A protein has these predicted regions:
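Bacterial N-terminal signal peptides that target proteins for export
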Residues: 1-8
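Bacterial signal peptide processing site
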Residues: 20-24
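Acidic/His-rich structured neighborhood in mature extracellular/periplasmic domains
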Residues: 81-249, 264
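Post-signal peptide N-terminal segment of mature Sec-exported envelope proteins
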Residues: 25-58
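Acidic/histidine-rich, surface-exposed loop or edge segments in extracytoplasmic proteins
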Residues: 53-70, 124-134, 319-320, 336
Length: 381
């Protein structure tokens, strides 16, 4: 899921607001460079999140509103049950988050911008107060996100702006009413709404500064495990609806994973080809990359032909580049390790969370090594 979170901070040091504060990046000399758009970026973060909070009303108010559509009421009542399930069955935080609903009247809550070098899947990072450095930058205004992506492309980077249906403030806004349920995802299949809520609540269990892959993989593991448990007690119709949705997603994920591995292979191989001149190497890389992407789009067309007209991934495929595959990796690269840890802890949620907290307390290099040790070897995949 690309679920990816754009305004990660409603910080104690930033009164009232989602002040996702862009830490100064380093220039080639290692010195800090303060972005010219810094103040404007803070302002849009504050204004955007406060507008979202103002739009949110308690679920009970929506359920009592005679003008609210019956289908919406039914889903919001279901969300209340999901929220209780998250606490009782998954031991996720019991707080104000997802007890209110906001109709944003737009297709995304924020738009994230991600970027990589032309021949790498290493995400460019931006740094924020408290939450550390992350591989994306979020905007409430779609045009601003696309403008940043265009500036990054002008610098020679692969960059993309994409819509995000939800984000987490990590529990820091519970005193303001918490993160609300949003119109941007309320219409998803039942199982997917449950997974999204579980994912975002998992970020409130723990969050490690400067380790996007660890944070997102942990939350993705919780969403998958929790989603399975929710669907096990859901109606047959809900399971069937979700099964069709998830089958397409699994097939698409398998396709994009193979493309990601192909890109990683050609970029790694290029580092060893010292005999080629820089220009020859660059031209060869560009040709190889183009071939991989052309093959990807052809294979996607073949996959889509069996989906009965479903076109939900068309926009992703149309804009796909290194950055698209890199951000996808951040959400699932370490998931198998967390799944293995859950089994090791006897599928006991409190024990699992305690074990993850122990990992989180380690220095990053040591933490990564511990996680890698639980990942399957390539021959096992």
């Amino acid at each position: 899921m690309a679920v990816h979170r754009a305004v990660l901070a409603l910080l104690a040091s930033c009164a009232l607001a989602a002040c996702s504060t862009s830490g100064p990046p380093a220039d080639s000399t290692g010195h800090a460079v303060v972005p010219r758009e810094g103040v404007a970026y803070y302002a849009q973060s504050v204004a955007g999140h406060l507008a979202l909070m103002r739009a949110a009303r308690p679920l009970e108010d929506w359920l009592a509103d005679p003008a609210a559509p019956p289908a919406l009421k039914e889903r919001l009542a279901q969300v209340q049950r999901m929220r209780r399930f998250a606490v009782d069955e998954l031991h996720l935080p019991d707080n104000a988050s997802y007890t209110r609903y906001a109709d944003l009247k737009r297709r995304a809550v924020v738009w994230n911008v991600v970027a990589t070098p032309e021949f790498s899947l290493q995400l460019k990072t931006w740094c924020f107060v408290v939450v550390g450095c992350v591989g994306y930058r979020g905007y409430f205004d779609e045009a601003e996100a696309h403008a940043l992506a265009e500036r990054l492309r002008a610098q020679g980077l692969d960059a993309v702006a994409y819509p995000v249906p939800a984000y987490s403030t990590l529990g820091w806004t519970n005193w303001l009413g918490g993160d609300p349920v949003l119109s941007t995802f309320i219409g998803y299949p039942e199982g997917e709404v449950a997974r999204l809520l579980f994912h975002e609540l998992a970020h409130q269990v723990l969050y490690v500064a400067d380790d996007t892959e660890f944070n997102e993989s942990f939350a993705t593991a919780v969403e998958r495990l929790g989603g399975e448990r929710w669907l096990a007690q859901a109606s047959p119709a809900a399971r069937a609806d979700y099964a069709a949705f998830d089958e397409r997603r699994r097939a698409f994920r398998a396709l994009t994973l193979s493309v990601r591995k192909n890109l990683e292979r050609i970029y790694a191989q290029a580092l060893d080809e010292h005999a080629l001149s820089a220009i020859e190497n660059e031209n060869a890389l560009r040709a190889s990359k183009h071939a991989v992407m052309a093959d990807f789009r052809q294979r996607y067309a073949e996959l889509k032909a069996g989906w009965g007209g479903h076109s939900g991934y068309d926009a992703w495929v149309a804009r796909a580049n290194n950055a698209s595959f890199a951000v996808q990796a951040a959400y699932d690269a370490q998931v198998p390790a967390f799944m293995a840890l859950f089994e090791r802890e006897g599928r006991d949620w409190p024990r699992f969370y305690d074990a993850v907290r122990e990992w989180a307390a380690l220095p990053k290099a040591e933490r990564t090594a511990v996680v890698q040790a639980l990942l399957p070897s390539p021959s096992d995949e």
